[in-house]
Amino acid sequence: LETFQPVHPGEARVYSCGPTVYNYQHIGNMRAYVFADTLGRVLSYKGYKLTHVINITDVGHLTSDADAGEDKMEKMAASQGKSAWDIAAFYQADFEADLARLNIRKPAHPKATEYVDAMIAWGKEIAEKHCYELDSGLYFDVSTVPEYGRLARAVTDDGEGRIEEVDGKRNKADFAIWRKTPEGETRQMEWDSPWGRGAPGWHLECSV
């Protein structure tokens, strides 16, 4: 066990990786938020000023969960004949209703699409020392961070199980910071960037 030592005395910050709002949440999804809410309540009870953030992934999560495939938002939008923005709004509202039904205190809900400019800025900041570009996008080189994976006790030689092999990647565990829109395609959710038109990868979304 370790003694909890906040960065700022009297304050505690809890970040929960939020849902990809392309479909309804199931009980396994919600379990994580019950745990985080319980932690937050204990911290509040102990007198800490709590900030709890659950991000909303409304772009950039691919169907394989392994850094490859179609964007889940775009795929669901096409199947329902709606825009990706409409899909995101509908399922975010349903997720928030689920939180209320479970008596989970309402956290802050920043949406990924509201912070794309900040994501691009952060990508530019780390690109020179930590990233490399392929035809498919900008990738983070995990070998540039000697202690990468320490917090999760990950073994980088084996890689992370849900990260896909991509031609040209330097390391199996390297992941996409920015995914370029394939030539000849147009997506509903895409932005201009120094690495071409496309969308952020979900690792970049969570870190920003």
Residues covered by each model-derived region:
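NTP-dependent nucleotidyl-transfer catalytic core
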Residues: L1-V208
